[in-house]
Amino acid sequence: MDTATKPSVVPPATAPGDGDGAQQAGKATPPVAQQKPLSERKPKLARQDDKWKIFSGTANDALAKDICEFLGLPLGQACISKFSDGETYVQIEENVRGADVFMVQPTCDPVDVHLMQLLLLIDALKRASARRITVVIPYFGYARQDRKDKPRVPISSKLVADLLTTAGADRALVVDLHAPQIQGFFNIPVDHLFASPVLVDYFRKKQFPDLTVVSPDAGGVERARFFAKKMDSALAIVDKRRVEMDVTEVMHVIGDVKGRTCLILDDIIDTAGTLVKTCQALLEAGARQVYACATHPVLSGPAIERISQSGLAEVVVTNTIPLTEAGRNEPKIKVQSVHGLIGRAIQSIHEETSVSRLFL
């Protein structure tokens, strides 16, 4: 068996007060307009007991550590390694009997490895008598296989939901599902967070006077309309059509973008092919500059090279998926953290309070 991989313990915060929203000695509470978004404010003192714990797989332990630091909790100790034949081995290395446990693990590339880790960790926690297990899945792999679009194919996202439930998960916390109806595939409660508060706050600070939010396809119109409303901006849509077989898609821009700053909004950037084509169509339609933002930076294949060589001014993503070294070194890619958003949701679930206050 190979050497175990152990998440390091994050020491408790030294001053876990009310953070930016707190009234400090001799200082008045700042105006609401100057405060950070609710999802990014430091929480009130987390209850320092051993009845709630946060663990992480290897998919995004940096995000898990940030969440723990935000809440003033240590990261739970777990051993994750492989046997010589490639089988995954996990062991929970501390007592979880009667604890409210949160397991942070996006099922990103390599998807099957991270999914198997998650299933085994859930099973280990259940057999160790954890009182409740909440799977925190910032990026839900297989979400794009949510229906039968061809004969004799599986509905993979439904199968994954069943596997998580069968393994012993009592609750799920997810961020920006590709298809919101996936919540209905679960037989357990699902809290569906949106990264919009983090992304809206980032672009509000830029104070674009002529912003138009753009949906890259018809399926994303509702998401773009919601974002445009929060940004008090115009809305445009790019309609892709293939006029003939074996003929390149023609992209029609619906809406006024001439001389304006355009912001392409999507939930996932995978190969970045659609993103770059949308950017080119907007520039050809007279857009002054084009930005893009998405929650999940899958960035597979030639994505980073395409972004680098494109006319995009900036691509803003979140850390639901860790970037590769090439992604971190690409100056056009900017990362905003969702650790505060997820941390607030975890605290609300543990304290049995409403999670909806985190929504825009």
Question: Predicted regions span which residues?
Answer:
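PRPP-associated nucleotide enzymes
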Residues: 1-360
